Amino acid sequence: MKKAFVVFLFVLFLSVPAAFPQAGPVEGGHELQVWTGGGHGLSGSQSGDGVWNVGLRYGLILTAPHGPGFLHGRLEYAVDVVPVFLVVQKTNTAYGVGVNPFGFKWALDTRRSVVPYFEIGGGTLFTNTKVPEGTSRINFTSSGALGLHFLRSKYNISTEVRYMHISNAGLATPNPGINTIQFRLGFGLFSQKE
């Protein structure tokens, strides 16, 4: 499975130079995206847990390109609504919804059809059963991601690797949290400033 995923990403990266780029993110423009992602818990007591989620993103490009050298880029503020968030645990599967109102993305200004970015964010997660088991149905999420936008003529495809921590922040005892590594795929567009 791992090898197939690596081959898929390699082929995707090879196809990028042939893509006709759309206009990328610009100051005052917007990002609209639908995405899905999933992964597993990292080492520790919750390492057997798996997650899968689907979300919608609205982003606002806040700045024109600035910054030194290879970090020259734009800042984006983003909000994700997550209508599907599954946590597969040892004894059950938790079904949840979330909202991530704190997303900050730095998209590098490459002037090419591939736009690397990194991102941090946070939000809430509400589930029908306790996550992790025996803790709380209300949790908070914090995350960091590294990704690539592949700009096409009208739309873009995004791929990223995301670290996410899920925790009740002390609302219940115990508070073991779940640390996950996820792979995310998005389909969206950047609207231009009018």
Residue ranges of predicted features:
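Cleavable N-terminal export/targeting peptides
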Residues: 1-26, 192-194
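Short loop/turn motifs that connect adjacent beta-strands in outer-membrane beta-barrel proteins
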Residues: 20-29, 63-75, 109-115, 151-157, ...
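Residues that define the transmembrane beta-barrel architecture of outer-membrane proteins
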Residues: 28-30, 48-54, 93-100, 114, ...
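Residues on the lipid-exposed face of transmembrane beta-strands in outer-membrane beta-barrel proteins
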Residues: 34, 38, 54-60, 102-108, ...
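Transmembrane beta-strand segments that form the barrel wall of outer-membrane beta-barrel proteins
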Residues: 32-42, 78-85, 120-126, 160-165
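Gram-negative (and chloroplast) outer-membrane scaffold detector with strong preference
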Residues: 54-128
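Extracellular loop and loop/strand-boundary signature of outer-membrane beta-barrel proteins
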Residues: 42-44, 89-91, 128-134, 169-175
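Short glycine/proline- and aromatic-enriched beta-strand/turn motifs that initiate or cap beta-hairpins
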Residues: 20-63, 175, 180-194
